[in-house]
């Protein structure tokens, strides 16, 4: 692990700095810069007909202003007084025998970057306390709709603003500080070890689920206690399903003994910060001719797109470049027919590359602030999760792919207008490839990018790793 990352993460999560940034964003959006910001953490929720709690996932906006992973907690930031207060559950004698003593206010104050720690039960009293002096009392509280429990009251305040806080948080969370980038680096470091472990286990594995287990266990053993999303471990034609989750197919044909290629899209989560990495490689240790041809196209798509990345460049333009490279490659193979210009104009490549090139990444895999437009009439951009220009300290994924999904492609083949652009006889050789996607995580810098992802992707190197096991 990178010692420089470890040194950064030895400090406190910069919650106070984040609170100040959000306050500045509120002011920049036309508000007077006064008031109290209010956020709740995730509540403990019990599974139906059970005394077990459902798996806990902390609210990301709450964590951004607290650094706290405890359930049933609150945070307030008094903008005028520059005071950040965390409210955590007090000890419940009935629970201590089962779960041990909870974090005390004194321990929490040492652990978190806040000015004061109170009990969760004191939230209403402290909100009222803000308003005891009418001359200096904040007039407004900023909160998020449907993120305030019934027990909380804002009656002491003259006004509750339900519109501004979510947008301010989204704008701030887009731009990562050094501490957040260190968390994302560590998440990538752990996930790189896990991807490499899967590559080494691939040749002898019998079922997709075995390789999912390798990924999860490697992450856990290195401090990543959760996954950014459900791992995608897709062999052969399963790789044509973008978010395949079954992960339960045998990896060897019982009749021929053939082993297909594998697509693994998986990322561990470290202290709520994500990684999102995809690699594809042959389970036998040697790409088939068709799989290698598609792999080379996708790697070229990613390389050319990454060459364009720097501040001020429109993500739409980078995404369009990926489609143009895909068209050129599929034309060379004879899968497509016609001119590059006409194929791009007709959006034929969408049949093989239906999703967006990438997205913001942070505490959420598909992080906030991307401004997608799923109503876009242009099918090439409809599923693009990031619309706009790049800025320094944003973190994006770059994940081009080429897929052979019958459900998507066959309507093109049967279309009188579009079918002529695809040679079905040539296409028939590629269905078994399933899909190839290559995905890295990049930090936008002042003059380009920093690639956080170190998992090998050179095809010869990948083959060698799988062969050696």
Swiss-Prot record:
Coiled coil: none annotated. Mn(2+) 2 binds at residues 265, 276, 439. Pfam families: AMP_N, Peptidase_M24. Binds 2 manganese ions per subunit. Its EC number is 3.4.11.9. GO terms for molecular function: manganese ion binding; metalloaminopeptidase activity. The keyword Transport does not apply. The keyword Manganese applies. It is an enzyme of class 3 (hydrolase). Keywords: Aminopeptidase, Hydrolase, Manganese, Metal-binding, Metalloprotease, Protease. Mn(2+) 1 binds at residues 276, 399, 439. Its cofactor is Mn(2+). SMART domains: AMP_N (SM01011). It catalyses: Release of any N-terminal amino acid, including proline, that is linked to proline, even from a dipeptide or tripeptide. GO terms for biological process: proteolysis. Belongs to the peptidase M24B family. Catalyzes the removal of a penultimate prolyl residue from the N-termini of peptides. PANTHER family: XAA-PRO AMINOPEPTIDASE 3, XAA-PRO DIPEPTIDASE. This is Probable Xaa-Pro aminopeptidase PEPP. It comes from Coccidioides posadasii (strain RMSCC 757 / Silveira) (Valley fever fungus).
């Amino acid at each position: 692990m990178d010692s420089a990352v470890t040194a950064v993460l030895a400090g406190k999560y910069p919650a106070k700095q984040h609170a100040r940034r959000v306050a500045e964003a509120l002011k920049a959006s036309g508000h007077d810069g006064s008031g109290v910001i209010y956020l709740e953490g995730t509540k403990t929720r019990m599974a139906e007909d059970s005394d077990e709690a459902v798996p806990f996932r902390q609210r990301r906006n709450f964590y951004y202003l607290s650094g706290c992973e405890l359930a049933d907690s609150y945070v307030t930031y008094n903008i005028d007084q520059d005071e950040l207060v965390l409210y955590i559950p007090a000890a419940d004698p009935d629970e201590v025998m089962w779960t041990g003593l909870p974090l005390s206010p004194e321990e929490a104050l040492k652990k978190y970057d806040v000015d004061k720690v109170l009990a969760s039960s004191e939230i209403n009293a402290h909100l009222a306390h803000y308003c005891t002096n009418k001359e200096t009392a904040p007039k407004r509280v900023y909160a998020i709709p449907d993120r305030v429990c019934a027990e909380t009251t804002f009656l002491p305040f003259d006004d509750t603003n339900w519109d501004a806080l979510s947008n301010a948080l989204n704008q701030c969370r887009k731009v990562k500080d050094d501490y957040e980038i260190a968390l994302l680096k560590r998440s990538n470091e752990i996930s790189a070890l896990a991807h490499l472990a899967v590559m080494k286990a691939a040749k002898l594995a019998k079922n997709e689920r075995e390789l999912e287990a390798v990924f999860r266990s490697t992450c856990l053993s290195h401090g990543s206690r959760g996954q950014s999303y459900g791992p995608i471990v897709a062999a052969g034609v399963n790789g044509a399903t973008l978010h395949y989750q079954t992960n339960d197919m045998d990896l060897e044909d019982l009749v021929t003994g053939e082993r297909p290629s594998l697509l693994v899209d998986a990322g561990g989560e470290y202290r709520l910060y994500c990684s999102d990495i995809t690699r594809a490689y042959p389970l036998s240790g040697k790409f088939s001719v068709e799989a290698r041809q598609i792999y080379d196209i996708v790697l070229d798509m990613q390389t050319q797109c990454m060459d364009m990345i720097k501040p001020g460049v429109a993500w739409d333009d980078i995404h369009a470049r990926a489609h143009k490279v895909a068209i050129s490659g599929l034309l060379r193979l004879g899968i497509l027919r016609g001119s590059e210009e006409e194929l791009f104009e007709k959006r034929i490549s969408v049949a093989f590359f239906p999703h967006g090139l990438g997205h913001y990444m942070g505490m959420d895999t598909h992080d906030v602030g991307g401004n997608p437009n799923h109503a876009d009439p242009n099918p090439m951009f409809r599923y693009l999760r990031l619309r706009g220009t790049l800025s320094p300290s944003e973190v994006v994924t770059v994940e081009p792919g080429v897929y052979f999904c019958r459900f998507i492609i066959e309507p093109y083949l049967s279309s009188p207008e579009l079918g002529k652009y695809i040679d079905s006889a040539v296409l028939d050789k590629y269905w078994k490839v399933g899909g190839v996607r290559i995905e890295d995580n990049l930090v936008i810098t002042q003059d380009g990018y920093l690639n956080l992802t170190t998992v090998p992707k050179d095809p010869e190197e990948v083959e060698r790793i799988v062969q050696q096991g």
